[in-house]
Amino acid sequence: MITSKQRSYLRTLSNTLQPIFQLGKAGIEENFLKQIVGALESRELIKIKVLNNSGMTAREASDIICEAINAEAVQTIGSKCVFYKTSLTKPKIELP
């Protein structure tokens, strides 16, 4: 669990990020989750865009993804979600 101060710090870091995944009509599948886990391990902070044809809102997708991979939802605005998970091998981001 991250504090509100840490969440605020992560939000500032995520402002310049571009979404690296798009969630479409295929939905949240096991392969999609594996790709997210790999990206979080290497980057620690990622942004995902939820397309209109996915059949779910960004908040719903964020809740499902966080529960499935034990990540922290930093922010959900519009159709974009930001996730954070500390890397087990090489932590890059040092939280305040």
Q: Where does each model-flagged region fall?
A:
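Positively charged, polar, low-complexity stretches
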Residues: 1-96
